[in-house]
Amino acid sequence: MAFNPELGSTSPAVLLDNAERLDKLVNGPAADVPDRGGDPLYSWRQMMAKNDEIRQNIIPLSKQYATLAAAQADIANIPEGSTTYYRSPDDSALAIEVMNVGGTLTATGRKMPSSQAVDSVRGLIDSQGENPFSVVFKNGLSPFGYKDGRLYADEFQKLYSSDAGLEFGGSIIDNNPPDGWRFVIYYRNGLVMCGQRNDGTMIGFGEGGSGGGSIEPGDTAADYDSIRNYTGTATVRDVVGQRTGGRFVVNPDDTTSGEIPGGILVDVLGRRWYRQAEFVSYDMFMAPRVPGATLLAVQVALAMGNRSSAIAYLSGVEAADAAIQNAHRYANLLNIPVRQNDGAFLVLVDHEAEVRTKTSLGGSIIFTSADSGVNEIRWGPLRLLDPTAPEPKRMFNIKGKERIELTPAELATFNTSYSQYLKKGSNYLPYPKLYPYYGGMFYALSNEVEIYRNGNRDNPRDRVLYRDFSRIGRNGALTERIVKDIPTGSIGYAAIIPKEDDFLEFECPHFIELGDSRRFLNIEVSRPMVRIKNLVHTSWQTASTSLESRVVISAREVFDVFCEYGETTCHPAENGSYVICIRDTCNVHIDNYYGLHGWGFQGHHGIKGLYGNRNTFNRVDFHSFGYDVFFKDLTVKGRQINLQGGNEWSIEKLRLYITRTSGDAVEYFLNYAIGMRQDYASDCDGILNIDGVTVMWDRGLPAWYNTTRSFDLVRIIDSANSLDQGIDSKLPPTITIRNIVFDLAGIQTGRPNDNFEFCAVTALRSQFTDYAVTGRKTLLPDNITVDGMTAINVQPIQNAVMCGIKLPADLYQNTVGSRNKKGSDGTNARITLRNLHSVINNPSIELAAAQTVDIPGDAANWTTDYLNSDYSWIPRITLDNCIPAIIHTPGAKAVVDIHGGKLARVYTNGNGNRCRVTSADIELIPDASGVTYFAADKTLVTGCSWLNPASGATYPGTLRGS
């Protein structure tokens, strides 16, 4: 009985048996050795022999012989019974197979056919009218095929399908031919392959009547002129060339189109040859590249800071504008993408490229130089105000469906029956013409002026007309609410911007501009639903010339614009230039953008819904009409944020870098971070929320604090002109600021000055214009809340005083400054300051020098109107856990409540302002003469601890309370 235990056994007998068998398999002479079940196993010698046999059989298969004699001479390497091939001596075959039979190569009868043989057989088939193509079932029936110049389906009675047709492999058979056709077959790009018209004309077959001829392959062409000069019968030709190569096919339906060099070629017979492609590139349209040596020279010159040499190197390079425009024209025609992912090109921006399809230019470079664009300010036409102003030069203009503009008759009807719905707070416009355009946008522009910029009534371009816009809902609903009270019956222009069928994506090249004072737009967005990605921009402009109206990305009267990833730089001295400029647009998203040194974001005359994430800008500007603006993780370096508009403004995690902008000169406005745009009446009637702010200073700055007493996070009124701009100045009704840190690591030794304040909210004037003269109100905030404010890296002998609210000495002049009537306590505004922690290393502060609440002035100036008006702005100020609380309120009526923290001063100059203090420490801080200030007659103290005054001073007065 065979020794055959179960697999997996670990008995000593099994292990010994395995060892003996392995020794025989590896070292024994036998060809095979039985396993423990009795079945033979190949030994190592047997396996090596088999491998050699296989190798010998493979050798002849890898060899090719020119003649039979050459193969016979190598018979030693062709094993007995193996086959090999030698080249046929004539055109009857490509190669002939032979076998080694007893040392002699003998023909097997098998041959590899040549192309000539295949062509001969095909010719015989054609001449006999047989099927060059057929579908054959297993039973031998051929129900479908092509013969005698026609498609046939003899065995089919009917082919049924739904209205959608049949789809297979990504292709579709549709049972509803287009108008004018009995049947037609299209290429994927829309060109007709073949078909039959209703009048019986055959297209694309041998006897076609439209001049198209048959679909015959042609030879290759060396260049486009070879196709232009071609007179043969072929309708398919291949251009062979570096970067320009591709297949061209005659379009028999097109007899009128002009050439698009590289896309549509017209031959001497008048046929139109269309490029067949899944996408096109600028190279295909013969866009001249910047030669490699020139590009290297330009890059080296720029690396050395030699801009003029770089311009000189590019002066001999041919511009690529026309080729770029042609590439997009052809892509638009066939609805295919444009891709150019390498190469460098020079553009003069003489005409714009119209973009209607997905575009990918990442990896390529577009230069502009001393002759690109124009050397003049061009903001473009203004509807109704300056309609004939020259258009700006544009490099790319992204377009979509045509807008629907209301006719004069439709405007008259709208003004009579529907314009009354365009009032602030409305989300309803029952205008029937809007109903079919659900999801689009309605835009209305009034003939009436809302604002005169800077009070200028002479220049039409300084007039801001009433306007409003919103996306269209169902049956009269509006997505965005109306924000303006447009005068009824005043609409002078209105349009519907339709919703697109898809989002268009534009991936940017690296834009490099060299010329000074050259104005143009890189990308104009003239259609909604656009994604602009991966912008890289470098400017070598100098500081000596203006760049006003220079814009990289512009969008106007559209919606759903997404700007994703950007790196843009320019010179710091340039004003009026922006990396992104948005006008009259809904729903804009800007993410991961870096726009410094003169570049920033501008919401100019109209934006609803701006969402920004992780951006770094030189400045953020809203000239007029910014509504619902939300920034997260925003860095502003060098300048500031200017606001105008309303609804809600929200900024989370804001970093401010205060630095020089031009040599050693730092502009005046750099002593504040967020301001209300003065040239538009400081009008910002919305909620302002700021959460998480860090402010830092450049160590190399000059003594910027010598000419000003504060740095203001939010400045609600500045010190500009007081001209009547046509509207009331409506400051944010609610301001909420949380978690502010002033990092003073960059402040010079011995600074800031002792009379310096770090302010949360500041007004430098009580009125934007004099109400008694202009009749224009200045409405101050109803509610101000500051929660969490301190400084770090303060020098050991310096103070850093946190000021929650700083108001002007002329507050009494604004007798209509409140939106609300006074309450029973005599106040109509609320200011709440929590957790303001000043750093006091030198406990000596002069009177009116630096305080937590700063309302200077003299009660002797108060007028009867100020005291008696129900709408004089009178705040109730609450301080919670502020250390120290320094109260300075001689200039205006106010009520002050202090809870917790540490009280250092209450000064009213005897104006009767009340103050209540609960659960606080009281440690008075004297001035340099040791004088302390505490208005004991109007200050009621409850549950507080009295500490000795700081710096060894004494308090000679009394306390009132318990």
Task: Set out the residue ranges of the language-model regions.
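Right-handed parallel beta-helix
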Residues: 425, 430, 439-466, 510-635
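Short, charged, low-hydrophobicity "junction" segments
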Residues: 51-59, 119, 394-425, 453-457, ...
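Surface-exposed or flexible loop/turn and strand-edge residues in extracellular/cell-surface modules
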Residues: 81, 130-132, 141, 146-148, ...
